[in-house]
Structure formats: structure tokens, C-alpha cells
Amino acid sequence: MLKKAVYNREDFLKLNNLPQRLRIWAEDTELEDYIRDEAFYHRALPRKAPMALEPLKVAVVGSGPAGLGCADQLNRLGYDVTVFERDDRPGGLLMYGVPNIKLPKDLLMEKINDLQARGVKFVLGWELNAPEDFDKLQKDFAAVVLCVGSRKEKNLPGIEVDNKQIFHAKDFLTEVTKDMLNGTEYANLKGKDVVIIGGGDTGVDCAAIALAQGANTVHQLERQECDATANSVRDNLCNIVQGDFTIKYGTQMKRLIRDEEGKLKAVETVQVEWRSERAGALPDALPVLGSEKLLRAQVLILALGFKGPEDEIFEA
């Protein structure tokens, strides 16, 4: 049993009984290599680049990948750039949405510090959620660029997120990284049974973190069959996951089971098959009778993707 959570690649790869798919996930350094070798370097600009005739002030709202990239380009073109971020650290998805195992945060901060050294300013703890906020930006800056990303999570009907036993993946990953960066590493999934709904990249991130925190069991559910998923051709995935008990394809959650005190204790699942009930109709995930199973679960993480920007952005 882990004494504390593991949040770096080297130690993660030393974990016992690490599924091959998560070993491949951890060994993939493509994102880290890009941030280190390509991102935000002060390269020579093309001759026809539209350089600013004067250092006009530009506001960039959001400091995720799009916001940082925008700030970098505008800075290189001679503009006076200020980046507004609602979190306590810049970086957005790169800071809080990607585990430290995949993207070391000290590397990311080196790049952000480089931008600051070039004159890009960062305002943290600032949120765009009212018309007067946007009005002030328009008054103080010659231009405003919105780089807020897609942060409105998808939900499952009847499932209420409480951030105690049931989490959205984004919130879970954010708190994990904040705990690590604030020096309060604690294995809050240690010894627990964890079920993750969603078989995409974010779900894989959550599965890896659950194992890194010493979870007792981890089960990731995906309605699609493996060969129908976006990642099926990558690294010969479908052959690799054969026999991997931590990922269940063609499976969906049927209902939650709680104890007498109302606490989550299990998830009932059912296998599905994709077929059309009538000619010409699109295939749908139809339950396979008699395939129901119970998975112990004290923690449920919803990694269902996003619907778009939050409503407050459009209201502002």
C-alpha cells in the first residue's frame, strides 16, 4: 500500500501491477517534449508579419493552451499583453487538466516565466462572469481575445455531483494538482474502490491518478467497443487491453447503489450491444439482458467530456 500519492513519471512506472495501457500512457512524452522544445520560443518572425506600430494593450481572457499561444504571438508582434486567469495559477488545462505525471508543472512554469520575462503580464483570480467585467476590459484595452475553452461538463441524468464521492473529472484532476503544488499531497483515494465513467483521454488520466493514489480497485467504463473508440488504432490498444480488468468496453452504468446512510457503495453495470432497432436507424447502445454486474465503489468520477463554454461567458 502506498504511503503517499505518486505524481511523477519515474515513480509511477515503478508501481506494482500497472496495466500496460497506463504504462504506455505514462511513457508517452509527446506533450512534455513539445512544451519543452517547441512552445513559446522567441523565433524570428516572417517578413510580412503585421507588427504593431505602437504597443497597443490587448487583453487575453484565459491562460490555457489557446490563451498562452495567443499571448505569445501578440507579444512577438509588439503588443502589450495582459492575460486574465480565474485560477490561482496560469496554465489552464495544461496546469490543472493534465496530471503532473504526463506534464511536469515545473516545466510549464518555466515557459510561463519566460513569457513574463518578455513582458506578458498575468492577472490571477479574475473571472469574466458579468457584463460590467467585459465592459471594463473593452474600456481599458484596445482589443480583447476570449480563450476560455470548453469547461461546461456533460452530466448523467439523475447523478448529482457532490465532490465527496461523486466528481467531475476536471474538478478531481484540478484538486489533485493543487494538493501536489501546495505541498499537501495526500492519497485521498487510498484503499478505495473507484469507478470512472468515460473511456477517453481524461478518463485515462483519472484512472492513472487513482492508481497513483493507491486505490484498491479501479474500473473505467466505456459504452463503445474498443475498436470504435478514437484511440483504438493507437499503440495497438485493443490487443493491449485484452484481459485488462481496469477498463470495460461495451459497458455502461445502470444505477448507483447506496448504503443505509445514503453513501455510495456500488455501481451496477450492464453490457451493451450497438445495433439498430429498425431499418435505416442509427445504431444505439442497447442493454444485454442478464449481463448486469456490481462493482464496489466509494468514488465515482464522471469523465464524459464537455458541452462548450460556460453560460456566464455568453451572458457577459
Stretches with model-predicted labels:
Residues F40-V58, T174-K192:
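A short, basic/flexible loop-to-alpha-helix module at the beginning of a structural domain
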Residues G198:
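Active-site glycine-centered loops adjacent to acidic/histidine catalytic or metal-binding residues
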Residues L2-Y7, T29-K48, L53:
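Short microdomains enriched in Cys/His and/or Lys/Arg
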Residues D106-K154, D171, V176-T184, L189, ...:
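A Rossmann-like FAD-binding core segment of flavoenzymes
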Residues E10-E38, V144, V148-S150, L156-D162:
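Helix-enriched interaction subdomains in cytosolic or periplasmic regions
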